[in-house]
């Protein structure tokens, strides 16, 4: 079956070579006569998989030795709770509010008993269309939480704030798509289903001195327990870890994160440049804050937006509908999304615009 152009914000497009390798190895991994889905997580075969995955992500992101790499479950949403539970330790937790997911992280942190939350900067006053300036954080705070890419609103934080306290980053929608210096962060977390692999896996990178600060946490929610058990306190999402390892190998073959970022910038520039010169489509995001991976755009009417999404779907451009809280359209151009798909989308946008400039709406 011919593949379509999948603009889903997550779960998202995976590299075709990875899917093909998964297909080849599905019934018998490494000559074992068993699928990866059937391997014991205590087996040597799976231990090699998770060890290789960790080694690759350390190489790709330049993760120092004094950081632990954890392959967990529960999505980035569980980290909204685990971070304050493990790191706040009676101190103030400081957050930057740049979008829907940041708001959820803030809301969850406020539910943790004994955690005082301060929102130090926000872009909500202009519908999260920009990245706010972040003031100096008091040294008595536990951490500063930021969201490096706002999937729904289409903004990104490329410059990590210098901070006297650990910076915690939700990188779910731009991890491995842009180069970041891991040493600037105390903790990084990301749901896998955008740039890493299938849903069900969460990557956590945490500096060792931040582990074990709080006693008596539930074992599954304790970074210390997870680190001491090599991400296998309970059965990890074995198949998702395996696919992530293959994705890491693919990224390495593309020239690493720097090579991927160069391609992502080229893809994003094509679409942004077209939108900028268009008198039919527009971007709701300030130019300096525009994401490379999630690009929202709108026409001048909800009726045209609806018609565009419907006709795009019929023409093989899937999952372009914007998030229900924002509307319009959103093209998610994650690492595995081909540049040919961007070029094809632009051609379709031009055709749609030319057919509608007389005001006709066909829904």
UniProtKB/Swiss-Prot annotation:
Modification N6-(pyridoxal phosphate)lysine, positions: 194
Cofactor or coenzyme needed: pyridoxal 5'-phosphate
SUPFAM superfamilies in UniProt: PLP-dependent transferases
The family this protein is said to belong to: Belongs to the class-V pyridoxal-phosphate-dependent aminotransferase family. SerC subfamily.
Catalytic activity: O-phospho-L-serine + 2-oxoglutarate = 3-phosphooxypyruvate + L-glutamate; 4-(phosphooxy)-L-threonine + 2-oxoglutarate = (R)-3-hydroxy-2-oxo-4-phosphooxybutanoate + L-glutamate
Species in which this protein is naturally found: Listeria innocua serovar 6a (strain ATCC BAA-680 / CLIP 11262)
Annotated EC: 2.6.1.52
Subcellular location as annotated: Cytoplasm
Sequence positions that bind L-glutamate: 42
Protein name, entry field: Phosphoserine aminotransferase
GO cellular component: cytoplasm
Sorted UniProt keywords: Amino-acid biosynthesis, Aminotransferase, Cytoplasm, Pyridoxal phosphate, Pyridoxine biosynthesis, Serine biosynthesis, Transferase
Assembly and oligomerization: Homodimer.
Main location: cytoplasm
UniProt pathway annotation: Amino-acid biosynthesis; L-serine biosynthesis; L-serine from 3-phospho-D-glycerate: step 2/3
Binding site for pyridoxal 5'-phosphate: 76-77, 101, 151, 170, 193, 234-235
GO MF annotation terms: O-phospho-L-serine:2-oxoglutarate aminotransferase activity; pyridoxal phosphate binding
InterPro entries noted in UniProt: Aminotrans_V_dom, Aminotrans_V_PyrdxlP_BS, Pser_aminoTfrase, PyrdxlP-dep_Trfase, PyrdxlP-dep_Trfase_major, PyrdxlP-dep_Trfase_small
Any one Gene Ontology BP term: L-serine biosynthetic process
Protein purpose: Catalyzes the reversible conversion of 3-phosphohydroxypyruvate to phosphoserine and of 3-hydroxy-2-oxo-4-phosphonooxybutanoate to phosphohydroxythreonine.
Transmembrane segments: none
HAMAP family the UniProt entry points to: SerC_aminotrans_5
PANTHER family: PHOSPHOSERINE AMINOTRANSFERASE
Top-level taxonomic group: Bacteria
UniProt remark on cofactor binding: Binds 1 pyridoxal phosphate per subunit.
